[in-house]
Design a protein with these regions (language model features):
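N-terminal, positively charged nucleic-acid-binding surface of large information/translation enzymes
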Residues: 1-198
């Protein structure tokens, strides 16, 4: 039986049309997937789009469109780009897909919740809409995000956090032993550092 090899592109936000960065990433992932197939691996190559978030809602509003209509149009552009580039992905999934994505996400949520792996906490900080992430003061220059030239919003929100600490040792051993391979090596080291930092 052939060794399994899983590869994915990032799932970009559909707040704008695809850009050269996504094309480059898709081509790079495709090269790796094709090479692994040549080596006889059982490859599963996934791509898709992330269709949830504040910047998507804001982009749809700025375009004067319903959010669903907006994400449908933009997701199709990402999918078409992969076809035009001849990318050999096995699947393309959208996070708004109620038939495919939702059931799997809901099942995972129920499982980790049942196992006590979710912790509900209030988090507050500086939120950069462009990054769809919280940032720190040290990430800012003169109070603004350097990538988006915008001041982050001060937010306080209740969120669920995954209790990674419960699995850190097992994950670290799997990575270090090579059972779980992360390519490139710099990303492997980044993940190990993240695990070690708690």
């Amino acid at each position: 039986m052939a060794e399994k090899f899983y590869i994915t592109t990032a799932i970009p936000y559909v707040n704008a049309r695809p850009h050269v960065g996504f094309a480059l990433e898709a081509i790079q992932a495709d090269v790796v997937a094709r090479f692994m197939r040549i080596l006889g691996r059982d490859v599963w190559f996934l791509s898709g789009t992330d269709e949830h978030g504040a910047k998507i809602s804001r982009a749809a509003q700025a375009a004067g469109k319903d959010v669903r209509e907006f994400v449908d149009e933009h997701a199709e552009l990402f999918k078409k780009l992969l076809a035009v580039l001849g990318i050999s992905n096995d699947d393309f999934i959208r996070t708004s897909d109620e038939n495919r994505h939702f059931p799997g996400a809901a099942a995972l949520w129920r499982l980790i919740s049942k196992n006590g792996d979710l912790v509900k906490k209030t988090y507050q900080g500086l939120y950069c809409v462009g990054h769809e992430a919280f940032v720190t003061e040290k990430d800012l220059v003169r109070g603004k995000c350097v990538d988006h030239n915008a001041e982050p919003e001060r937010l306080e929100e209740e969120n669920y956090f995954f209790r990674l600490s419960r699995y850190a040792g097992k994950i670290k051993r799997a990575i270090e032993s090579g059972e779980l391979k992360i390519i490139p090596e710099t990303r492997r080291n980044e993940i190990l550092t993240l695990i070690e930092s708690g």
